[in-house]
Amino acid sequence: MNPLLEAQTAEELERVWKSPRWNGILRTYTAEDVLKLRGTWKIDYTIARLGSEKFWKMLHTSDYILTAGALTGSHAIQLVEAGLKAIYVSGWQVAADNNLSGNMYPDLGLYPSNSTPHLIMKITRALQRADQIQHLEKRNNHIDYFAPIIADGEAGFGGPLHAFELMKAMIEAGAAAVHFEDQSPSERRCGHLGSKVLVPTKRFINILTAARLAADVLGVPSIIIARTDAIGAQYLTSDADPRDRKYLTGVRTQEGYHAIRSGIEMAIDRGLAYAPYAEMLWFETSQPSLEEAKQFADAIRRKYPGKLLAYNLSPSFNWVKLLDGETLAEFNKKLGQMGYKFQFITLAGFHTLNASMFELAKNIAEQGVEAYASFQSKEIELEKKGFRGFKHQRFVGVNYYDEVLMTIEGGETITALTNSTENSQFV
């Protein structure tokens, strides 16, 4: 049942919006506006819808949700099989190694905007295949592969219309939640690089509104996350919004941008302005600090009690250098107590892929095939903890397609897995 999509009249849709799920969410448009934009085809985006509903429930029943960034479909399967309950899809990782241009980019908003939806589609299909294989094998230790996907919408890749279309593409691919940030799309860069340029507060609210409208038109209760980069930004594109003017220094750049006094106060002001338009808020930090996190959380929740918060456990931080062991051990728990219900290590996929491959390659260069044999021994040990990638043929579904072929040919066929080296040597 999808009440958002099943509403036939503006009155019915307005009643849905008055349910507890939408408490604290402000829409600047009407239900009639949404119905006018829907057309007559009722398409239920099941993966995104059920993922959003599941993620929403998790946010309200867990101390916090911790996950990492997946760079491939196989990465996503590993996250789930290891016990994580959600999948994060990072724009940085898409730019670096999985975008549709085929190039390696830094996180400067250079890659095609449909790249992240494409990766989400690959991830949902990989998770579905893992579920199909599990179902076929009738495993006793059932794994729920249907993990909500939280995706990076960057700065929207343009204006409100671009954000509207991007949000639609994310939903169509299967995203449960999408975050957008208040940087200028044309100057957009990684949150931990310098010379960041913000858009006016009102302009970003329009981006959030565009994303909400897209979700409403598609009839999906998507979770929208509003991120502010105000702590580390240097410039503002325009002084059009009076709320921003107290942070201007009076200095202009050659491009016409306004230099600003950024910091936690500006981040709080922007978070408060964005709160009615998003389910969750995220302030991008320059270092991991429980004190700074508490300052932001207290200010937001003083006006918006219970507002959901997100925290980037960024690989751009030198965690061992900045925090002692005791602080690290309690970091997630204390963030959760402050209201940071979604915590994520954005670039985990990139770093594990590169570090593990370098380590293996270095050992192979020095030891030959003996190094790979040692690596296999590690995989065998990981199997005891639930790792399934060691038997790679079975992992990708050879047995599944054997079953497909036998079904087509009435059981009279030669199967691929039966006579494989994997079946004879790895069982």
List the model feature ranges, each with a label.
Residues 1-2, 16:
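Universal eukaryotic N-terminal targeting presequences
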Residues 15, 19-37, 41-46, 50-57, ...:
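Alpha/beta enzyme core
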Residues 61-65:
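A short, charged/proline- and glycine-enriched loop
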Residues 326-417:
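Conserved alpha/beta catalytic core and glycan-binding cleft of carbohydrate-active enzymes
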